[in-house]
Structure formats: structure tokens, C-alpha cells
Amino acid sequence: MRKLNPYFGEFGGQYVPEILIPALDQLEQAFIDAQNDPSFQQEFQDLLKNYAGRPTALTLCRNLTQGTRTRLYLKREDLLHGGAHKTNQVLGQALLAKRMGKTEIIAETGAGQHGVATALACALLNMKCRIYMGAKDVERQSPNVFRMRLMGAEVIPVHSGSSTLKDACNEALRDWSGCYERAHYLLGTAAGPHPYPTIVREFQRMIGDEAKAQILAREGRLPDAVIACIGGGSNAIGLFASFIPETSVQLIGVEPAGKGIETGEHGAPLKHGKLGIYFGMKSPIMQTEEGQIEESYSISAGLDFPSVGPQHAHLNSIGRADYVSVTDDEAIEAFKTLSRREGIIPALESSHALAYALKLIAQNPDKEQLLIVNLSGRGDKDIFTVNDILAARGEI
């Protein structure tokens, strides 16, 4: 009998081949046991503090908001070991895998940040590591590929389909179905078959828990809005989870509009997709008129995903969270602006959330507002991509 609800409203579920059901049931039970085991929690918290570097800072952007009445804070997941929020839940899942007696880890990665986090956790915990990555992403994220291999991971380029994240996910699941007795599939986002969306949220929720305590200590009140980018949605649900009960706080998720929603080259299934079943879950998906999975597109590899986590779909359906989109060009402008005005180079993924915050500020410069943006990762991995774009424009 299930202990955790596999659905968020009508979204979620467990649509996988029958062969994987025992592995998912084992994972669910291990997670429940671990959540109630003080020694597991102590080990996890110790790794987060003394290995990963939590809590992360909440940084006030004084320069960006000059001349306005906005106070804009960044939740600095870019300062976490590994360079992004991914490290949080990877450490949790890797400890779970050890607890279940697994010796191998299988993972997928888009921007490479989840791959790096998985590689470092496997090195630390002495586990074999296989990471599937779309061939296109291997090209555009070469620094992260090198980091993964340096830490002992086997990186497997995927050439099928669009050679991006969705194809890497498919290959990782296929691999796992043949070796789940010895391997754990370390899924990188709050999506996929139950119980992954719940596990990933719970192993990321310290982002929002910390941000809430930090903003209350600094400002004496809750923020008016918290803003995060959305690919699969793990950094956003990690930030949102603590604020969902606080109805005065607006939750804003920012999907990638890519080259513009009207061009069809985007990654915004929540607002522009149709309900379907993909990657083991029921959630909005980018689909063709024939019902096939449509290729998503974003300049940021970590947002280039044709579906979205089921809890975001639920929050959208009940109106608790607002989902908007930002184009490649707007994200690049935000990337440049934060780098030049605050000396912080953000990931292109995080730049989408920042771009929307800057829009809000520009629209209401005289409005007193308190905002938190989740700076989900650092931009080292994106400097070559942005350099090429700016060089082509003659801007550098």
C-alpha cells in the first residue's frame, strides 16, 4: 500500500514499464524510512553543511535597484559546492542509494550541473557513475563534461532524437530498467514517475526554508514574491515549498520563451503545452498536432525540456503560482546586467528568473516591493556560449 500520494491534483502518477514498479516501490519505502531516521537526517545535514556549504547566502542587490523602491534579494545557490542547487538533492538521493545497498548510479543531465553534482557525490561515496547527456549538450557544456570525467564519471553522449535532455532521460531510464537491482536512477529534477517529484522537492526544500528565515531576519517580513526559473522545476519547487502556505507571497515560475513563443522554438509547456503522459508522469507536454513530443528549445541547456514537474502543473491549475516566460535575448541581457552591476555571473537558467524580476522592477519603479530571486547556479559553464553571442553582435 502506498504511503505517499503519487498525484498532485490530476498531475503526476507512475506511468512506467511494470519491470520498474518494484524498484520505485523500494525507493519510496526507503525514502519514508530515511525521513524518519535521525541518523540519516544527521548524515544528510552534515554533508549539506560541511561538504556542500549550506546555508547559502541571501544577497541584497543594491546596484540593480538603485532609483527604485524595490529591495531585491538573490538566494545564492550558485555558491553551493558544484555550482548549483543540484548538489542538495543529489547528496540526499545518493545517501538513499547507499542505504538501499546500490553500488551504481545512473543519471541524466542537460546543462551538466546535475551531472557534476552526481559525479561529485559518487566520488565522495565511492559509487560507480554513468551519466547520459544529449550530444548537443555535450558540445555546448564542455567544461562540465570535463569536470564530470575528472571526478570519475562515465559520460555517455546521446545522439538519438534531438540529442538533448529529453533523449538523455529516455536512455537513462532504459539503462536502469536492465540493472535496477544494483543501480539507482538519480533523477535530476522534480519530475518523472512517483515518488521522484516528492523526493526531489523534500531534498530541495531547504532553499525556501533558509530563504524564509533569512528574509524575516533581514527585513522583518515575508517577501511579496519569490521568483525561480522552470525547466523540470526542482530549484523552483525547492524555493516555493516553504512559501506555498503563505498566501500573501506570490510564487512566480519563469519558463524559457526561447526565440519567442510565436516561433514555436521555446520550452514553455506549462502555458503552451497540452496534458499528456511522458517520462513516467501525467503533466503538460509540448506536443505536435499529432500528439508526438515536440522538440523544446532554450539557449540554456538546463531549461531545454518539453515537460514540467507535476506539482508545478498543479500549482498552475489552482492559481497558487503564476508562470510566465522570458526569451533568450532577455535572459542574456539579465546575465550581462547582473555580471556588470553586482559582480555576480549567473547561470543562463537563473538569468531567466532574474530577467523577469528586472521587468517587474522596471514596470513599477515607485512601487515598494520585496523580491527574492533564486540564483539557482553560477554562470561559469555559460561563458563560452554568451561570449560567442556577444562577439557575433560586436558587443565585446
Curated annotation (Swiss-Prot):
Swiss-Prot/TrEMBL cofactor(s): pyridoxal 5'-phosphate
A GO CC term assigned to this protein in UniProt: cytoplasm
Enzyme Commission number: 4.2.1.20
An annotated Gene Ontology molecular function: tryptophan synthase activity
Reactions it catalyzes: (1S,2R)-1-C-(indol-3-yl)glycerol 3-phosphate + L-serine = D-glyceraldehyde 3-phosphate + L-tryptophan + H2O
Entry keyword set: Amino-acid biosynthesis, Aromatic amino acid biosynthesis, Lyase, Pyridoxal phosphate, Tryptophan biosynthesis
Pfam families in alphabetical order: PALP
NCBIfam families: trpB
Modified residues (N6-(pyridoxal phosphate)lysine): K86
Chain's role: The beta subunit is responsible for the synthesis of L-tryptophan from indole and L-serine.
Protein name (record): Tryptophan synthase beta chain
Species whose genome carries this gene: Proteus mirabilis (strain HI4320)
Pathway annotation from the record: Amino-acid biosynthesis; L-tryptophan biosynthesis; L-tryptophan from chorismate: step 5/5
Family recorded in the similarity comment: Belongs to the TrpB family.
Assembly: Tetramer of two alpha and two beta chains.
